[in-house]
Amino acid sequence: MTTSGHACPVPAVNGHMTHYPATPYPLLFPPVIGGLSLPPLHGLHGHPPPSGCSTPSPATIETQSTSSEELVPSPPSPLPPPRVYKPCFVCQDKSSGYHYGVSACEGCKGFFRRSIQKNMIYTCHRDKNCVINKVTRNRCQYCRLQKCFEVGMSKESVRNDRNKKKKETSKQECTESYEMTAELDDLTEKIRKAHQETFPSLCQLGKYTTNSSADHRVRLDLGLWDKFSELATKCIIKIVEFAKRLPGFTGLTIADQITLLKAACLDILILRICTRYTPEQDTMTFSDGLTLNRTQMHNAGFGPLTDLVFTFANQLLPLEMDDTETGLLSAICLICGDRQDLEEPTKVDKLQEPLLEALKIYIRKRRPSKPHMFPKILMKITDLRSISAKGAERVITLKMEIPGSMPPLIQEMLENSEGHEPLTPSSSGNTAEHSPSISPSSVENSGVSQSPLVQ
């Protein structure tokens, strides 16, 4: 701005603008700065302006000052210190933040989320007062979940979080094609084959029956018990074979393989026998073709567990599961990172993820008009766990009632499984030698039994 043909002189002023050189601005903004001169600032200090110069209004000064400040780069702000959270309220491990209302570690956050989303039902095999810390947190799922509630973790937070994710993905779900990737297709085929080759379907078996205690319930029919325990031992060996054929299972530590097999063995045994249920005769058929009615199953050793198992078998009928779905569900039961005492639970969880995805896609492709069938089938795992927990207690009762007749492999599979007490005070030295169901490779030049789980 000029007046009377000459520019107003601009004296040096003490202020923030004097610390920055003016020369770069014409270089950076030549079209804007080139034709302008800075306004005089005399009026700010009470000095009259030189003749011929007008005093700018305060509004003009404020506007121009602000504009000038915007051109000046500010020094970078120092980074805030990292936020420090209180230890996990549940197990006292290092917290990763506030999850579901409390400070929690990643392990307890994931455990609580899975427990709520899957409606898990846990059982404490002690006095429901187990100590939960970073060392013991995987030993009792019941007490760990109760501790989560006690410290203030919120069910609603999990559900709200889930609903939020559902809304965010609802548009994607409408257009989802549910096509198998090559990897998932290969995984599904391997599991179907592993299941079929370790568990023949009902239509492949030549059924035969027995008249032994078929009409009325008794406490225990020793003849049926001997036959049942022999068949159960063979079934366990087939489950071990099935597990070893699951992609990735043998890549786990030996300890984790055994932990998973012990924890899931009864689940899979019950699932398998229930798929061989014939509702018209109310019978179940074993792998050698032996077919027992409900009364005989009770007398063979199932006892108070009998009606629970038959009810579960009836609930499976409307689901019309095929061999692929049964195999995948068995694999999901087995490979589960929630099992206590695992060395690498995160690795197990990651191994389970493609199994869940494969089952979801397979079910929805097979039943496109029944979108809710996948969660219905998956929820059967909760029922299986509840029944198998009672089944483990039943085996312990049988061990006390008929000492010396418990097959060693059944005993081993249930020993310390999911928090159960050992069936015997110490491992038997040479019982495995006398079991016709255990391969001779289980015993190597010694009278000491060696677990077939690690062969």
From Swiss-Prot:
Record's keyword terms, sorted: Cytoplasm, Disease variant, DNA-binding, Metal-binding, Microphthalmia, Nucleus, Phosphoprotein, Proto-oncogene, Receptor, Transcription, Transcription regulation, Zinc, Zinc-finger
Query: Looking at the keywords, is Membrane present?
Result: no
GO BP terms: namely: apoptotic process; cell differentiation; embryonic digestive tract development; embryonic eye morphogenesis; embryonic hindlimb morphogenesis; glandular epithelial cell development; growth plate cartilage development; multicellular organism growth
- This protein's GO CC annotations: chromatin; cytoplasm; nucleoplasm; nucleus
What tissues harbor this protein?
Expressed in aortic endothelial cells (at protein level).
Compositional bias ranges of the Low complexity kind: 435-455
Q: What is the effect of changing T123V?
A: Reduces transcriptional repression on DR1 and reduces transcriptional activation on DR5
Outcome reported for the amino acid change (mutating R367E): As a heterodimer with RXRA, reduces transcriptional repression on DR1 and reduces transcriptional activation on DR5. Reduces transcriptional repression on DR1 and reduces transcriptional activation on DR5
State the compartments where it is located: Nucleus; Cytoplasm
Phenotype when changing T188I:
No effect on transcriptional activation in the absence of hormone
Return the Polar residues bias intervals.
53-66, 424-434
- Chief place where the protein resides: nucleus
Q: Where is this region: Disordered?
A: 47-78, 415-455
Question: Can you state the subunit structure given in the record?
Answer: Homodimer. Heterodimer; with a RXR molecule. Binds DNA preferentially as a RAR/RXR heterodimer. Heterodimerizes (via NR LBD) with RXRA. Interacts weakly with NCOR2.
What is the purpose of this protein?
Answer: Receptor for retinoic acid. Retinoic acid receptors bind as heterodimers to their target response elements in response to their ligands, all-trans or 9-cis retinoic acid, and regulate gene expression in various biological processes. The RXR/RAR heterodimers bind to the retinoic acid response elements (RARE) composed of tandem 5'-AGGTCA-3' sites known as DR1-DR5. In the absence or presence of hormone ligand, acts mainly as an activator of gene expression due to weak binding to corepressors.
What the record says about its domains?
Composed of three domains: a modulating N-terminal domain, a DNA-binding domain and a C-terminal ligand-binding domain. The DNA-binding nuclear receptor domain and the NR LBD domain are required for binding of the RARB/RXRA heterodimer to both DR1 and DR5 DNA elements.
Q: What is this protein called?
A: Retinoic acid receptor beta
The root-end lineage is:
Eukaryota, Metazoa, Chordata, Craniata, Vertebrata
